[in-house]
Structure formats: C-alpha cells, structure tokens
Amino acid sequence: MRSSFLVSNPPFLPSLIPRYSSRKSIRRSRERFSFPESLRVSLLHGIRRNIEVAQGVQFDGPIMDRDVNLDDDLVVQVCVTRTLPPALTLELGLESLKEAIDELKTNPPKSSSGVLRFQVAVPPRAKALFWFCSQPTTSDVFPVFFLSKDTVEPSYKSLYVKEPHGVFGIGNAFAFVHSSSVDSNGHSMIKTFLSDESAMVTAYGFPDIEFNKYSTVNSKDGSSYFFVPQIELDEHEEVSILAVTLAWNESLSYTVEQTISSYEKSIFQVSSHFCPNVEDHWFKHLKSSLAKLSVEEIHPLEMEHMGFFTFSGRDQADVKELKSIQSSCQFHCKLSPDVVFSNNMLNRETEVSNFLRDEANINAVWASAIIEECTRLGLTYFCVAPGSRSSHLAIAAANHPLTTCLACFDERSLAFHAIGYAKGSLKPAVIITSSGTAVSNLLPAVVEASEDFLPLLLLTADRPPELQGVGANQAINQINHFGSFVRFFFNLPPPTDLIPVRMVLTTVDSALHWATGSACGPVHLNCPFRDPLDGSPTNWSSNCLNGLDMWMSNAEPFTKYFQVQSHKSDGVTTGQITEILQVIKEAKKGLLLIGAIHTEDEIWASLLLAKELMWPVVADVLSGVRLRKLFKPFVEKLTHVFVDHLDHALFSDSVRNLIEFDVVIQVGSRITSKRVSQMLEKCFPFAYILVDKHPCRHDPSHLVTHRVQSNIVQFANCVLKSRFPWRRSKLHGHLQALDGAIAREMSFQISAESSLTEPYVAHMLSKALTSKSALFIGNSMPIRDVDMYGCSSENSSHVVDMMLSAELPCQWIQVTGNRGASGIDGLLSSATGFAVGCKKRVVCVVGDISFLHDTNGLAILKQRIARKPMTILVINNRGGGIFRLLPIAKKTEPSVLNQYFYTAHDISIENLCLAHGVRYVHVGTKSELEDALFVPSVEEMDCIVEVESSINANAIVHSTLERFARQAAENSLGIVSASSFLHPMIKNVLLCQVSGIQYSQYRVKLCDRPTICSDEFSQFHREGFILSLTLEDGSIGYGEVAPLNSNVENLMDVEGQLQLVLHLMNEAKFSYMLPLLNGSISSWIWSELGITASSIFPSVRCGLEMALLNAMAVRHDSSLLGILHYQKEENGSAQPHSVQICALLDSEGTPLEVAYVARKLVQEGFSAIKLKVGRRVSSVQDALVMQEVRRAVGVQIELRADANCRWTFEEAREFGLLVNSCNLKYIEEPVQNKDDLIRFHEETGLPVALDETLDDFEECPLRMLTKYTHPGIVAVVIKPSVVGGFENAALIARWAQQHGKMAVISAAYESGLGLSAYILFASYLEMENVKASTEQKQGTPPSVAHGLGTYRWLSEDVMMNTLGIFRSPYSGFVEGFIADASRNLKDVKINNDVIVRTSKGIPVRRYELRVDVDGFSHFIRVHDVGENAEGSVALFLHGFLGTGEEWIPIMTGISGSARCISVDIPGHGRSRVQSHASETQTSPTFSMEMIAEALYKLIEQITPGKVTIVGYSMGARIALYMALRFSNKIEGAVVVSGSPGLKDPVARKIRSATDDSKARMMVDNGLYIFIENWYNGGLWKSLRNHPHFSKIAASRLLHGDVPSVAKLLSDLSSGRQPSLWEELEDCDTNISLVFGEKDVKYKQIATRMYREMSKSKKSVNNIIEIVEIPEAGHAVHLESPLRVILALRKFLTRVHNSSTETELSQKLLLALKEM
C-alpha cells in the first residue's frame, strides 16, 4: 500500500460516514447547493510530506477551533498571487505558466516558507472535463479530479446535454490536517495556517474520512481530507482561470526545489496529455473519454470544496473565518491509484454488444447502430419529426440513454431549431424525418446552415428502391435532394444482413467528418427502410456484426479522423503569412473589422488581437464585442478604440470624405452595416486581409487582397507573436472623437423621447444582457437597430477583478442570428435551439412578420427541453416596417405598400400565445419594457413580450436619429479639424493643457434686495468668485462661481471646493471635444480630475465649465457661441445678433404700485415681464396684482409669474382660476408638491413652467423629466449655476425643445461676466432650436425672452467692460447683444475695486520635525497647509502604505476653516528614524503606544492648543486611540473607515500572525508584489474602479524604508493594538465616524461604534456623529474627496462652536462663583 496524508477536521462538517474500503462510495445526506460567484478561503491548515502519493506542504486546519489554546505559537502563511497576461488558448496559458516557473527557478524565493500562486486567464470554455478525461488511467500524479458545477439534477447524461462548467485539478500543493494543540508530552505546539484575502485559492476534499500514509481510506468522525491542487483549471461563464500553486516549508523538510520538482511532474503529465487540435470538436471524443473512468460507482458521495469568505459576525468586525462548505454531487476524484471517488460520472448502461444482438430485426439493428455511432461522435441532440417511414430511427433515438429528443409536427421549424442548436453548442443536431415532402420542408434550414457554415446531420427515411418512380405513396426522389447545399450526401441501401454494419458506421463517421470540416455545413444520409412499421422479430444473421468486437468493447467511434499538424505550426511564419505580417507591420492607418463570430474562443482571440494591434475596431453586432460590458476603469481608456457608431458617422459626407485606410483586417464572417461596406468600397484600394476558417469566397465587393484560411485563434497567435510597434494615427483620434460624440447624442435622443420606440428597445436590450445571457436577433429591422443603437455598458461581474488584472478591458456578450441567407423564416425555432445549445438565458428579438412566419415555433418553445427560460421580444409594428425606410416608399402608392410590402395585419399575438400556453406580456411604455427586461420573473418560464410600435412612427424616429447623428458627426469633425489645424496634437490626441488657474472673491453692490432673499435680508450685495484659467499657449478663460447661499451650497463650502479644483486642475489636460457637451464634460471631470460630476457644487461646476469653454474660445480666436455652435463658413446662415431679455419684477406694494413699475419696464423696452408671486398673505391678493399689471401693460406684453413652490394646491388653484383671463405665458412652480403640477394645469388651464423641480436631479435629469412631457408643462426655466453648468443646462433645454417646450435661461444675480456667458449660451440654444425646427420643416420657432433681467440689480460690476444689454435701435426691445458679450469674454477687464482677495492655491509647506521616543529620534515629514486666525488645527493621518501627500487635496479644501497638517507616519514615506539606544536595538517598535506618543509630542511642537485629528484606516485607529487616551490635546477625531481594533482573543491572535506573515511577504518579495496582492482584496473593489487607481497604487511605492513599513504592519497590527471597544462609551471627545456607502464591513463597524458611544456621554456638548459618503468604498478620501471636505468642514465648524460655547460656559460659571 502507498502512503498518504493525515488530514483535517472541519468542525462545521457532519461526521456520519460509516467505515468503508477503497473503490467504494458512501451515501451521505447533504443539502444541494448553488455555487457562489467566487470561491475563496480565509484560514486553512497543515504541513506534512507524502513521499509516494501526493507530495506537498500541510497546514493545520482548515479552521481554528473556538477553544484554541492561546498559548500555542501561531504562524499564518500568506499566499502571494501573480496574475499573468491573458493567454490566447489553454495551451498557451500552460506555456505562460511554465515560463513564470522557469523564471522562478532562476531566481528562487529567499524565504524559508511560502505559498505562491500563478494564474492566467484563458478562454471561458477551456474544457476542464475533456482535459481531465485526457489524463492517463495510470496517472503518476495524484490527486487528479474533475468537479462539475452543475447544480440541477446532475447525471451522467447531463455531461452530454449540459456540458457543465467545472474544475480540473492535479497534484497536491498543500493539504490540511487537524492536530491537537498539545503533543503527547503536554507541550505546546506550533500551529500553521494559510491565510489569503485576495487569491482565488480553493481547497477540495471529503469530510469524515481518514486518508492515511498507507493510502487507505477509513471512515472517521472528526477527520477529513482537503487539498489545494498544484495545477487547476476553473471554468466560469466569463473566463476560465488556469493556475499553478506552489508551497514549501524548509522547517518541515520541504524545500522550494522539492515543490518545483513535484510541480514539474504534474505539468509534464498534463502537457503530455493535452490535445489542442481536438479542442474545436472535443465533443466527438467525450463518450470514449468518459468510458475510461473504470471505477464502479455504487452510491453517491458529495465532494466538498471550500472557498475564501470574509466573516464579521462575531464581536470583532474584521476576523475572517470559513463558512459552511459548498458541495458538488458530480465529480470524479483519484486520491491515489487505489482510492477513487466518483458520483454521476459513470455510465452503468448495458453494453453495446448486448443491445445490438438483441434487436428484433435488421431494421432495428441498423437504426440502433446509426444512433449509437452518433452518440459516440458526441451527437446527442435529436430533432424528430413524426412519421411512419422513420419509426425505427425515432425509436432508437428515443431509447438511447444518452440522447435528448425533441419532437415537432413541423419539419421546417424543427430544422431551424437544429440550426439554432448548432449555433449555440457548436456541434450538429441530428434531424430525423419521414419521407416525401417532410424532407423537402428541411430545405430552407439546409440553405441557412450551408450559407452560415453550420454543421447539421439529416437522417431522412425513404422508400426502398423498388418503390421509387412507380407511384408509391410518399415516394419522391430524395437522391441529392438538397443539391449543392449539403457538404456530403450518401444514399444508404435498405437494411440487410448481407451488408456489414461496419458500412453504416463508417458512413456516419464520414458524414460527420464532412459536417465539421473546414467548411462546416449540413450533411445528408438518406435511409430507405422496408416495412418500417413492422416491429415483429425476424431472423437476421449476426454475421453482419463481424468485425465489430473491438467497437462493441469500447465507446469510441468506428472511424476516427485525424489531421496531422506540426506541433510548431502555430509558431512558424513563412511564405504568405510572412507577407501578411509585413503588410500589417507597415500599416499607418489600419482598421480591425470584426464580423460575425460563433465561438467564445474566437471572440476571446479577437479581443486579444485588438489589444495587440491597437487599431480602431469596428465590431459587428454578431461579433460578441459590439454589445460588450465595460469594466469601469476602462470606460475612458484609449487602449481599445471601438468605433461603435461608424455607421451613424457615415451619414455625414464630411466623414465619408475624411476616412481612408491603408490596411483593413477582417476577422469573422459577414458584417451587417451596408454603409460600412460602402465605405470600404470608397476607400479602396488598400490591403484587405480577410480571415475565416472556411475556404469559401466571402467578398461581395471584390476587395479582398489577402485571404487567410484560418480560424481567428490561429491568426491571432501569429500576430501576437510578431509584436508589432504601436502607431496611433491622426485618424485614430478623429474616429474616437466622432464615436464619443455620436454615442452621447444617440443616447440622449433615444432617452429623451418619451414614447417607446424601436431604437429604444435595441438600446435598452443591450443594457439588459449579462455574461450569463445571450442574444438572438431576428433579421430585417431588429438586427439593424441593435447594430446601430445597441450600446456597451458597465459591468460589475465577480470576474471583473480577474479580467482587470489580466488587462482585458471588457467582457463580451454572445450574440447570434440567422445571417447565412438572412431570411425571416424559422427565427423563433432557431432561437429556442440556440438557447438549448448555448446553455444560457437567451433573449430573442424579432419583428412581427418574422414571428408570424414561425408560429409553429411556439410549439417547440412550449416543450422547454434542456434549456433555461427565454424572453422573446416581438416588435409589432403591424407589418414589414423596413420597407418604409427604403427609397421605394417615397415613390410608391400607400395602398400598394400596405398590400405588397408592409403586409399589414391585425393578428393577435396574445391569442397565439394563449393558444400555445405560452406566457404573454404587452408593453407600451419605456417603464413597462424595463420591467419586462430587468425585473426577474418569479416563475422560471418563457415569456413573449409584445412591443407595440407603428411603421410610420418608426420611420420618423429613424429619420430624426439619422439627422441628429449626422449633425453630431459634422459638429465633432468640425471641431477636430479646426483644432488639429490650428494646434498640434499631443500624441495624436487633441488635448489642451492647463498651465495656471486662480480664483478671486468678489463683492458687488446691489441697488435692491434680490427677490430670492427674505424680508429680513438688508445687505444689498452679491458675493461670488471669478475663476481664471490659463492654457499653455497663454489663452485665458474666465468663469463665474456665484452660489446662492442656500441649504445646498454656501460661500465657504464653495471656496473649499474651489481650492480642491485649483489643486486638481494644475497641469490638467482636456479634450477639444468638451464644447460638444452632452456628457463630454462629465466624463472628463471623472477621468481627468478623478471626482464625480455630481459631487461638485452646481455653481462651482458652472464656473469651471464657463472658464474652460471661454479659454478654448480664446485659444481658437472664437467666442463661446462659436465653439458651442460649430458652423461651416460655407453654410452661409447668419447668426442672430441678440437675444431678448425678460424683466424681473418683485410684486411688493399695492396692485397699482406694481402696475406702475410694470408700465415703466415696458417703456424701457421690455417685451416680457416676470412677476414674483406667493409673497402675500393670500393668493387672491397676488391675483389682483396680476390683473392690474395686465391692464397696465396691455395684451402685447408677455407676462409670466413665479411662485417658487410657495403655495398649497388649493392656494395655487385659487390664483390660477382668478388670472385665467390675464393670458399668462406660464407660471413657474405654483405648488409645493411637484406631483400636483399637472393637476394644477388641468384644473386651471394655466400653463406651467419648471424651475425648482430642475434643481433636484443629479447626473441624469432625463428620467426625472419624463414625468413632465404633459403639454400643460410649456417651459423650463434653467439657471445654469443651479442645475450645474452649461452641459446640464443644454441637456434640459434640448429635452424641452424636443418636446415643444420653451427653454428659458435665467440668471441668479450673477455679475456681468456670468450674464455675458448666459447671453451667448441662450443664443446657442436658440440657434439649435431653429436648426432642428428647420430640418423638421416645422417653421421658425418664436424667439424666447430669457430671464437675464437681474442685471438691473447690479449697482457695480466685476467687469469694467460695458454689459451688452440695452434697448435695440432696431426692434425697440431690451436685448442682450452677442457681439458685446463675445467681446467682453474675450478681453475681460476685471474691476479690482470689487475684488476682496485672490488665490492661486494654498501653498504647501514641507519640513521635518524631530521627536524622541524610547531612545530613537523620529524625523517626521510634515505637510503644512493654511493658517487660521482662530487657532484651529487639524492633523491628518494616512492609512497603511499611504503618505501625508494623499491628504493635501482635502487639506487645501478645508484650509479656510483650520490650519491643516498631514504627516508621514513613522515608517512611511520620507519619515526616518535614528537610533540612540544600544546596538542590540537597531529599530524601534512601531506599536500603537509608540506612534501615539510620537504624534503627541509632534502636536506639542505644532500648537499649544488642542487639535482635531483626522485619520483614515490605520490612521483612523491611531486617531481614535489618541482621542481616547490624549483628550487633553485632542478636541475632536474624525475616524474615516476605521475601527477600535479587535476584542476577541482568538481573532487578535490570528490577525497579528496574519500581519506578521504579510510583513515577511513584503520584505521577501518586495513592495511591488506586495502592493499587487494587497489591492486585489475585496476591500478595494471600489477603489480599483477609480480612474486614477494606477496612479494611486504607484504612489504606494514611494517609501524610503521598506523594512520599516513591514515592521510597522506587524507592530501596529489590529491584533496587537489595545482593543478600544470597552472605552468607547467613556469617550469625552468629539467624534465623527465616516465611511463609504459601498464599504459594507466598515459601515457595520461604524454603526456599532456609534451605538457604543451614544450610550453615555460625559459632556452634553460632545458631538458623536456618523457620516455615510455616497458612491465611495473604503478609501473614501480618495474616491470622493469633495464630499469628505464638506463633511470635515461641517464637523470642524461644529467642534469649534462647541469649544467656544464650552469656554463661554466655563467663564460664566467662574464669574458666577466669583460673585
């Protein structure tokens, strides 16, 4: 017997296993599970060497007992994980891992123990099962196993039907043993655990067994055997992970050399038994491979596996503990040559020889042989059409244990179903039909399969030869019935025992070889039968079975086909491929065109090809990457330029004339877009390289110059090995700019339309898809709409982290359709087949005519065989809507179109569904569609979703979108062309760079109290800031920041944000495309500044946008209007010279007094007046004023009212009824409740305008505005400084204009600078509206009087320039003149008399302070920002690996409230230490006590008073400790993502041991590898999504003394610091607990801390608050600095006020005592 391991005792596993011997399985009752999204382990155990069976390290475990002896020595080993670049194939992934290990051998680890994991992403369907089955039965390496992830009734048959994802593993990296904490002599022992918080390490094993050193297995309660494989392939939906794990421990006599030697045995075996050339058709070999598993399966036994999980349910919140282990009940595991466990993996059916010899007659023998050979070839899915002639084939298929049969009465639908199955499974389905026209009905599907290269096996029954041509029933000529559309035809003779059955088998084998060859396609076997209905026994000679003994003794096909290839063929680049590679290398303007792709391996390869070439990528909707899911950090990256909207861009003549390529590579099949094809024709000649695996000609335009017959994987391999230099052309930047502009425009137009449109369906459909779903698109309009209006979207899948580190920026979505012949027949049936084949949840979208063309497909849908539920969208526009978009529609009579093209109908789809028993849902609105797509059905059932549409409305929508796409393309191209001509591009990207920025605070006098102020307001002045932005060429742009001092923002908070903006904008770069607005500025703010646009105060964003746009205008020698409204010179349309101004009237006084003022305004030249209402005792009084004003000004003057949400509904209704005769243009916000706005209009008839309602939206107002499309809402009043700048204002205005509403720009008492910008912006909106109306032939819209009359309140101005608002000599009305406004903004002259102060940013003073602690001098790096007259000081402490630098942006933001100081905590950054102690103590102990003492002494040097201490993570623990222990010096503490430490002794011991191990890992492997592993943890998921994550991670490398950083990690471990939980309720310091919304762990900790602190306060004035920062994770201050600044400023103010009150109280009390 061989020796083996003693293994662990997981306390959470049942121990009910009886004794058993090897090769026997045990029945255990366990609840079935669903696999988690990720498999992770927290604490594992054991180290011990096995000499013969499975060498490896052993750890204690797999989990520490609750009553562990705390006197034990504890060691925790950290796994170091290295992620390699993604591999093109599984084989190349192995090579990548080999190279990594070879490098490790040349530079072996210096540590005496360790665990290393190398992992690489490989294509998702890497075939773990086949790789496992390829291993030799006499394996030299153990354990070796396969574990299925199938959780729904797994069985041997399900391996064929479902092809489940699974795990293959081999070798033993380490295993786990359970051991007592004392030895036999009672001495304490060293316990060793494995702890990993980031790697995807998984342990596998069995509970309640003892696998001993003699390689025997016994049942033993409390024992278990778990191991981590040395080599592992783990398959997921999105990606597969191939990994190698190595472990060593020299103290247990297992060295690095030994573990590498063991690995080499494992890698040699798996590499030697790996057949890449059969990967494409591995299903042919599955049955024979599974047959090799010769172990007898007696009873089911579940194989346990466990993963890493975070546990926080005990007293402490950061202890990790294993949860209950998930289990699988389909597996095969060889622990040794003699110990094998298996369940649901083996076939226990009767041998083939028996059932063939037992057949009743020769017909049954041949039929059974055909079906058996099909199953051996991997064909297990049979589509059976009922019929007498095919009865023997149907019965044989139905009775075979491995087949899945589907029956349908309609052969046509059945055949299309088989096509769909081939698309999804990549293997043929078998179609069985009777004779006659049943065969003919297959022709449409055969044509589609032939044209789309889909494998299909047709078994058509037939009459025997003697009944042919003699008028026999159902006898037609079936010889070569499908002509050239099949790859192979053979007419079998009628069954007879005179012909060896071998002939039948070789014919089937040959047919499948043709079906799956390089030109895949349908094959046809015609099968004549005599007496097909006679099942009675007849004598037949078994001699026909001669020669089948070997075949009947195994599970392999009779004839196996092999293609001999050189093992070096992929790496050789000779002959023609060398010529092609040279063409690619010399390309200057390359384009990668990705056509239709069926396989995930090829989609994966196309992504890696795009990543290597770095060319612009145009992806067809059927490519799988057109509707990709983007990982958030890559949304703004330039690495992959997918030009998704090239089809839209080509509507523009300018774009068509611009584009030219010198090399185009097309991988995949046909492309959908006709305009892209036309573009290629126009660009020709160029080198056109077409790559496809079939040899057929696919070149309708006759452009292909280089035809490569190869699959995409092979071609990509050649390209990837060549390593081409990257060239980024100017065209590359142009296409990127075009695509971004059009994408934003299409998104806006589709979303802004209130009704449900067909483009909206395509747009939302793409967002609803996930990696676990797939899309089947119907022909005609659906595929064109999805190709044009589908979009990529962000993804948050669990594999994101892996694919990010693997440098793959996106995840694909499997998409298919019937594009071989592009017919509309059989689509529903094809979609159901696709769902069966791909094993995913399929969404299908078809038109109504396509649906009606295949209603028999509902019968197949109803059967729901072997697939997941489907959602089928039927776009019902009552006919063939595509013809309405064709030129013929303009020249043909409507009656002819309706009858012969549209084929209009009134068929009820609902009734059809009802008749077939299929669930039906009707949607007519956007929200209903979203519910149907996004809200999961409680019932797991299929659903037909009918989307109501109309042909004419759809045509109008498409025409409108085409027009706006063309405009967006023209505008963006105009900006790009002008910019690139005037200024050189930075690395071929159009960017400006900021060279300087400053702001000045102003204070101007007003001549009256603003109408926004209360009656108590008596100071007539306006305060704000002027932002000045200088570009690298000296161009200067000005912007105004004018907060209204509301509850949203005030002057002090705004200045804090401005200071941060100044810091972030230093040398920032921005694109010339910002003037396109429509999301471009928001994207830039996030990608360049690293802050979300929604976190910026509206007035700050408005001023920033104003400055940016004005600077760009100056740079281009243009104006704000000129860059917003790009217009070609040859266009010739004159720009407006002015915009009308609406006067503002505060309705104080009697009705006659107000009317008098109104009359004076009319005399001054105002054509419109807005009255403020809602200020009086009752609305009746306001109505009387309005009536009097109307009488005074006459009917020609436009009157508006503004109630500012002051009235109840009843009050507003009363006003509305009284002023109905006053002909008001509108009233703004008449009611307090926004839900009453439409009701108010309906009951009063008074038009309503939105104003304050617009203030409530955040980043996307369109969804909110959808509620206000009612015609009674006639206008939107937009204050740019309130809604957040020009981009948001333009978005709202465009929505309003699109829905026929007025867009009125309104000022908020800005200075002349802001008013000048608003004049130009209002003019831009007017011009856009005129342009849109003209193109829609709606006539010229009336001019709008904009709400800029607040200029009359200005007693003085910020600018010395004359404000260009005066009475026009031409119109006689008061207007804002564009020329004056443009001139003012181009040459701004600041009135220094109103400037209070100017700031170019807060300077940072950097210096060192020395503090002496415990015989060491610590020279602490200090960053000092700001001065505060009142003496407030805030000390900022960074987290582990950080430095004081990371706090500087926030410190600048709150420097106006306090002097801000950050430090490099001892051991970090540039802080250093010098020893004055004995030589034996060369480094200090960085304990909590030592750090706190050092900082305390530092504070004493900084200030004699108290400080508020702000700490993040590790710094937060220090801050809390100091707040509790040094309250005499600390007046407040802000604990950001921090904790009080650990209370549980076991948790403390584990955590300190874990941190010790991490410290050793840092010293042994270096800081770079440590940081790579550190930030792979789940705690940092949100931070990894930040656009500046790479920069943040790089900043963590800037530490001068890495050993000190490592020592601090150990010494300051939360397991060693004093637990502060017991002290919280005695805290007498002001505390603010801050955490991120996404940081679940620290949110729970903060909540618990808050409860503890709130129990008892020592002072009634103490502040205890809890603050949640939206849209942020653990690193709150880095992810959302503006919101942190706001929270800190408020807390510091409260602390200061509280301290002041306390001092006053103490003085008062002292005075009273003295009295």
UniProtKB/Swiss-Prot annotation:
| Essential cofactor(s) | Mg(2+); Mn(2+); thiamine diphosphate
Record region (Inactive isochorismate synthase): 20-273
Outline the segment boundaries, as ranges, of region: O-succinylbenzoate synthase.
981-1364
Q: Which UniProt keywords apply?
A: Chloroplast, Lyase, Magnesium, Manganese, Membrane, Metal-binding, Multifunctional enzyme, Plastid, Thiamine pyrophosphate, Transferase, Transit peptide, Transmembrane, Transmembrane helix
Which GO terms label this protein's molecular function in UniProt?
A: 2-succinyl-5-enolpyruvyl-6-hydroxy-3-cyclohexene-1-carboxylic-acid synthase activity; 2-succinyl-6-hydroxy-2,4-cyclohexadiene-1-carboxylate synthase activity; metal ion binding; O-succinylbenzoate synthase activity; thiamine pyrophosphate binding
Q: Which CDD domains match?
A: TPP_PYR_MenD, TPP_SHCHC_synthase
> Which residue ranges does the record annotate as region 2-succinyl-6-hydroxy-2,4-cyclohexadiene-1-carboxylate synthase?
1418-1715
Inactivation phenotype:
High chlorophyll fluorescence and lack of phylloquinone.
Gene Ontology biological process: amino acid catabolic process; menaquinone biosynthetic process; photosystem I stabilization; phylloquinone biosynthetic process
Cite the active-site annotation.
K1170 (proton donor), K1279 (proton acceptor)
Q: Which residues cross the membrane?
A: 429-449
Q: Where in the cell is it found?
A: Plastid, Chloroplast membrane
The GO cellular component terms are: chloroplast membrane
Ranges where the record places region 2-succinyl-5-enolpyruvyl-6-hydroxy-3-cyclohexene-1-carboxylate synthase: 363-933
| Annotated catalysed reactions | isochorismate + 2-oxoglutarate + H(+) = 5-enolpyruvoyl-6-hydroxy-2-succinyl-cyclohex-3-ene-1-carboxylate + CO2; (1R,6R)-6-hydroxy-2-succinyl-cyclohexa-2,4-diene-1-carboxylate = 2-succinylbenzoate + H2O; 5-enolpyruvoyl-6-hydroxy-2-succinyl-cyclohex-3-ene-1-carboxylate = (1R,6R)-6-hydroxy-2-succinyl-cyclohexa-2,4-diene-1-carboxylate + pyruvate
Q: Where is the transit peptide?
A: 1-19
Function text: Multifunctional enzyme required for phylloquinone (vitamin K1) biosynthesis.
Q: What other facts are recorded?
A: Consists of a fusion of four bacterial genes, menF, menD, menC and menH belonging to the same operon. In higher plants, the C-terminal chorismate binding domain is absent from the isochorismate synthase (MenF) module, leading to a non-functional module. The isochorismate synthase activity has been taken over by ISC1 and ICS2. In green and red algae lineages, this module has maintained its structural integrity and is functional.
Full protein name: Protein PHYLLO, chloroplastic
Q: What lineage is this protein's organism placed in?
A: Eukaryota, Viridiplantae, Streptophyta, Embryophyta, Tracheophyta
